[in-house]
């Protein structure tokens, strides 16, 4: 099954300026992500960036670059620009791999592509079980609840589902009903084209989660439990030091 990986790599970052180019053990972070994507068996890998320095680093590593505008409001909008520039057919399977995930396992890149290809749905993603209270109550860990067929009912920064009886006794432990969403998505190119025609939803603005736009407009997102748990992503200088140590 063929699929394309697109890696959005926006240069500007409030907490970590020039994030795609930060050095991790002798290589720019974006090159580590590119290498993980190559291991997935993708037919084509494209780094979508708004900065010439990022483009040069990717091309020096033998990667393909698509220059995009700097004013996109979301990663999906950046994907849509690449879809149009590359003239992908509507049924092309595209996996969006975040440019700040240098430890992402290649197996889950392939997994999300396979899951999408096996279903008549426009979008698929992954999640992992939550086993500790700290993560369950952390608003930076996005939770997802599913229906009986594995489709998302809702994504939230809140603790969902709320375990009424357990939490009435205390908030120290959690059961087996919590899933943390992973920021990796598979789409069909035609779905991306439709997504960017929709107005942002109120829920999307409240939670600051762009995938809620899909549910708002009545579309389905399939969610599978990831075969592997990805390593730390890089959002802050502290994350960067942790990743450097783990990848040493």
From Swiss-Prot:
Pfam families: CTP_transf_3 (PF02348). GO terms for molecular function: 3-deoxy-manno-octulosonate cytidylyltransferase activity. It is an enzyme of class 2 (transferase). One of its GO terms (biological process) is lipopolysaccharide biosynthetic process. The keyword Transferase applies. Gene3D superfamilies: Spore Coat Polysaccharide Biosynthesis Protein SpsA, Chain A. GO terms for cellular component: cytosol. SUPFAM superfamilies: Nucleotide-diphospho-sugar transferases (SSF53448). Its cofactor is Mg(2+). The keyword Nucleotidyltransferase applies. Keywords: Cytoplasm, Lipopolysaccharide biosynthesis, Magnesium, Nucleotidyltransferase, Transferase. It is found in: Cytoplasm. Pathway: Nucleotide-sugar biosynthesis; CMP-3-deoxy-D-manno-octulosonate biosynthesis; CMP-3-deoxy-D-manno-octulosonate from 3-deoxy-D-manno-octulosonate and CTP: step 1/1; Bacterial outer membrane biogenesis; lipopolysaccharide biosynthesis. Its EC number is 2.7.7.38. It catalyses: 3-deoxy-alpha-D-manno-oct-2-ulosonate + CTP = CMP-3-deoxy-beta-D-manno-octulosonate + diphosphate. Activates KDO (a required 8-carbon sugar) for incorporation into bacterial lipopolysaccharide in Gram-negative bacteria. Belongs to the KdsB family. HAMAP family: KdsB. This is 3-deoxy-manno-octulosonate cytidylyltransferase. It comes from Escherichia coli O157:H7. The gene is kdsB.
